[in-house]
Regions:
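N-terminal regions immediately upstream of nucleotidyltransferase
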Residues: 1-96, 102-110, 122-139, 317-323, ...
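Short, mixed-charge, low-aromatic patches
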Residues: 29-39, 108-117, 203-212, 228-234
């Protein structure tokens, strides 16, 4: 498969600036995105003449804070309309965000934001938890949680169509109602759900230990997620890694996106990519606070090790501890493909940083050593 670094740099710029998703923007915001895209980001003025290095530097960076602010503001705006509409129907709801945007590991300037709409009238719980065993949960509701979520979804769909008449309200998804266009400056995914008190949260009383059950209307059933624990644990390890973990996650997500554009099949979800790097060497990632390309080196080493040690890889859990990362054979095959993509990128960066590598077919270990000691001028 041919890897075109010039094309990948263009695609990276389009993703980060939002010009890749003009179709979901209204005309005013489309013009704003186009205008802002004319001015290159700081990474485009570094490593000039070293395209692979420049790509890695850009792929690791957080999306412009102004883009993220707009995404969060639009989610809040949608939440306010839903809150008013649902309360008028006698429903008490709460709102939280989940996913890549609140975790700051999104790679698109125009990113969908996941807005949880939580039915506050009830919650479910682990019957093995301490509060449940003590008999503290003794006021059952007269309806099933699943029927409540189905009703919540129906009400939310109706309200969104009424409050955002010019927007596209896509209700075909199993878990999310997707809004885009019209007066919305960014796409918002509305996810009907309710709280679930886990055994842990019954002890700690911390919201990050609470789960949420999300409606999957295609079955129908509710699915337990732990989005707040996931975000907290990514944030904790990122701080321990001197903010190198999130850079590594963004890098892998960008490489995956560009490889797919070129025809590769890498069915490894963003959640699992973050989970993979959560298990990387934090000290090696922390070195990226001085030697930025050390983050590339650790991502390459870590993926290569897992790809060569399937038995170990399959023991690794997602950060919230709810399941193995590689719970399907397809995901492990995707890891191998992503590892090969990273190997190729690392070799090309290594050759840009050390001319001696032009004359040999270097081993990955040689490439990693070059990346760990390379300094890219600002």
């Amino acid at each position: 498969m041919t890897r075109d670094i010039g094309k990948r740099l263009q695609q990276l710029k389009a993703r980060r600036s939002g010009t890749d998703r003009m179709a979901v923007l209204n005309s005013t915001d489309g013009l704003d995105v186009l205008a802002k895209s004319i001015y290159g980001e700081s990474y485009t003025r570094r490593a000039t003449g070293q395209k692979h290095t420049q790509y890695a530097l850009g792929a690791m960076q957080a999306v412009d804070a102004d883009y993220t602010r707009i995404s969060l503001a639009e989610a809040e705006r949608v939440g306010k309309q839903l809150d008013a509409g649902l309360r008028a129907r006698g429903r008490d709801v709460g709102f939280r965000l989940q996913g890549s945007v609140p975790c700051d590991i999104h790679i698109r300037g125009v990113s969908d934001v996941d807005l949880l709409v939580l039915d506050e009238a009830f919650f479910t719980y682990d019957t093995s938890g301490s509060r449940a065993r003590a008999g503290q949960f003794n006021s059952p509701v007269a309806y099933t949680p699943l029927s409540a979520l189905q009703s919540l979804r129906s009400g939310a769909e109706s309200i969104l169509k009424d409050k955002f008449p010019q927007a596209k309200v896509d209700t075909s998804g199993a878990k999310a109602i997707k809004l885009s266009g019209g007066s919305l400056r960014r796409p918002v995914d509305v996810v009907p759900s309710h709280w679930h008190d886990t055994s842990d949260s019954q002890v700690t009383w911390r919201e990050t230990d609470r789960g949420v059950r999300i409606l999957d209307k295609s079955i129908p059933e509710s699915v337990l997620n732990m989005p707040f624990r996931h975000i907290e644990r990514i944030n904790q390890r990122d701080a321990q890694a001197r903010y190198g973990l999130k850079k590594a996650i963004r890098l892998l997500k960008n490489v995956k996106a560009d490889a797919i554009e070129e025809g590769a099949k890498i069915p490894l979800p963003s959640f699992d990519i973050a989970s993979v790097m959560w298990h990387a060497d934090l000290g090696a990632l922390a070195a990226g606070s001085v030697y930025e390309l050390a983050i590339v080196a650790e991502a390459v080493r870590h993926l290569d090790y897992l790809a060569r040690n399937a038995a170990h890889a399959k023991t690794l859990l997602v950060p919230d501890g709810s399941r193995p990362i590689f719970n399907t054979a397809e995901k492990f095959e995707a890891l191998i493909q992503l590892s090969l993509e990273m190997d190729d990128l690392a070799v090309q960066i290594g050759r840009e940083q050390d001319r001696l590598l032009h004359h040999v077919q270097p081993s990955l270990r040689q490439v990693e050593e070059v990346l760990r000691r390379s300094v890219v001028p600002n």
